[in-house]
């Protein structure tokens, strides 16, 4: 009787092995990600040193996972300075590489800016770009 139950459990467990199929990563550079917004705007008045945070949501609408080769803050990379900081997919970094976004999944990019308006002419316009590179 114990051998019969053991045999059934083994057969039942083996039945699940074919379902553990990994999805092939989509490499076509023409497959675009969808962004909830194409701009992040901070409509905040700073009277003292302060910070504000906004977010951007990125979707993968395709039937397979996509790898984003790089996500980075352009000002920080090319000039070495930016008042912005990023939190990419839960990581407080200004750039990441090889981010896999599963089929139908999404991720958040949070942008925070810290400004000291003292001594500056108002209104203050500070810009930077978040760059997504694929393929």
Regions found by a protein language model. Name each.
Residues 47-48, 103, 122:
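Surface-exposed loops/turns
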Residues 53, 108, 127-129:
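Short, conserved beta-strand segments of beta-strand-rich sandwich/propeller modules, principally
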Residues 21-41, 51, 61-117:
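Surface-exposed binding patches on compact interaction domains or structured appendages
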Residues 48-56:
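Contiguous beta-strand segments within globular domains
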Residues 4-14:
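Sec-dependent N-terminal signal peptides
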Residues 115-135:
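Terminal connector regions
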Residues 16-19:
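C-terminal motif of bacterial Sec signal peptides marking the signal peptidase cleavage site
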Residues 57-59, 112, 131-133:
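Residue-level recognition of well-ordered beta-strand positions that form the cores
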């Amino acid at each position: 009787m114990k051998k019969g139950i053991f045999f059934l459990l083994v057969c039942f467990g083996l039945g699940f092995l074919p379902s553990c199929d990994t999805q092939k990563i989509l490499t076509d550079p023409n497959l675009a990600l969808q962004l909830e917004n194409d701009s992040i705007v901070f409509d905040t008045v700073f009277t003292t040193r302060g910070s504000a945070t906004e977010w951007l949501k990125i979707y993968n609408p395709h039937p397979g996972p996509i790898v984003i080769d790089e996500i980075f803050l352009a000002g920080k990379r090319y000039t070495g300075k930016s008042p912005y900081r990023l939190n990419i997919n839960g990581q407080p970094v200004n750039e990441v590489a090889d981010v896999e976004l599963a089929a139908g999944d999404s991720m958040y990019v949070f942008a925070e800016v810290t400004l000291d308006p003292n001594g500056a002419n108002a209104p203050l316009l500070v810009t930077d770009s978040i760059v997504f590179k694929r393929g």
